[in-house]
Amino acid sequence: MNSPEKLELLNQLLKHAKCAPFYQNRLPKNPLSSWDELKSIPLTTKEDLRRESPFGLIAVPRLELYQYHESFGTTGVPVSVWLTRDDYLAHAWEIGQWGVDFRSNDVVMVRFPYSISAAAHMVQSAAQWKQSCVIAAGARSSVSPASRIVTMLQKLEVTVLTCLPLQVLLIAEAAEMLGFKPSRDFPHLRVIGTAGEPLSISRRRMLEEIWGVPILDHYGMTEIGAAIMDCCYGQPHPLEDYFVFELLKDDFQTNAEEGEIGNLVVTPLYRLGTPMIRFVTGDRARYMNQQCRCGKNHILQIRGRKEHTITVGDRIFDIWDLEEIISHLPCRRFWAVGPLEQGLHFVVEQEKEDSGITQQLVEELKSRYSMDLKFEVLPKGTLYDRSDLLNVANVGKPEYIYTAQEMAEKAYAKSTKI
């Protein structure tokens, strides 16, 4: 709810944000007197952030900066985000509202990437704030492939796994390759927390079937922090006391109607190091006002990025729509899609020997979705090479001293590298 008290918080933020070079001449001189005036403030885009990085958005003295992160877009040009200690703690508090509900007796494995990006650090801080024990097992590291994750999940009796939805699937694949059944052989695991890519209802259901535990998502970005949290019932609720959310039509002036998909614009109310005023996230979202079993009554579904949609005629298909089609197939884990003149062309990986797609099923789906559909079933491993899941890199400490025999054998030429 956008209350008068929240407007006062926003005005305090706007006053503070003028300390950043980028916002000095960009914000109104006088406080906003109503929420309608918010649209008079220019939007902040990714292009603005790239142009002003690394220092143009800092709004505090350099001595107050506590942690640095970068966000990489498709251009590869990084966006700089500087946090004060209060910013860092606020992000941990935000993730502490997650329906995952970190507990003092939890063993939490953090599988988000640690290098430069923010999610892993914030999840770790939130878990430790709740007195949980954390295993830092960052993704994109040669020393912690999926096979090692599987071993640690079982050996260390992990109760909470946090990672990208794709990682949830890849870890399951590795477990199956090692002879485990994810829903049976990890009895201590009680919940999996995800973030980093859209999690549709269909994909959530598939992952829950594989693992036999709830999958709870949260939405955030390095630029804004963690803004939308799944409750324990899997419904995404915006943290409205800590953010201003706008959902705009494609003109970026008109508010989207309830239930209509619009463009998500977010202003964090408590970001001091690098304020973000009316930040265009690039994500499409849908707002619904409906009572949830948890007691909250606002739901904000993230539908994915606008560039990650396919248009067929006058119909737009986003990741939620595409995964809903995939959910009817016998092979649903790994897929890709492209447009046909009057429909969609899917390629899917075979999962079992009998997981072919019958012509009868194709015709039923064509009728259900009123368009042409083409499905190709590819051999397992075509889209994702499973061999990488089990590879462990040979790493170690630097070595300087060798025996005479090792010197003669030139062991130094093939010593383990860091």
Residue ranges and their predicted role:
Residues 1-93, 97-98, 104, 155, ...:
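Nucleotide 5′-phosphate-binding alpha/beta core
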Residues 199, 203-291:
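Conserved AMP-binding/adenylate-forming
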Residues 47-188, 198-206, 210, 234:
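Active-site phosphate/ATP/adenylate-binding loop shared across adenylate-forming ligases
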Residues 154-163, 209-214, 235-244, 393-403:
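A polyampholytic, Gly/Pro-enriched intrinsically disordered region
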Residues 16-17, 71, 161, 220, ...:
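Residue-level signal for inorganic ion chemistry
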Residues 161, 265, 270-372, 396:
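AMP-binding/adenylate-forming catalytic core of the ANL superfamily
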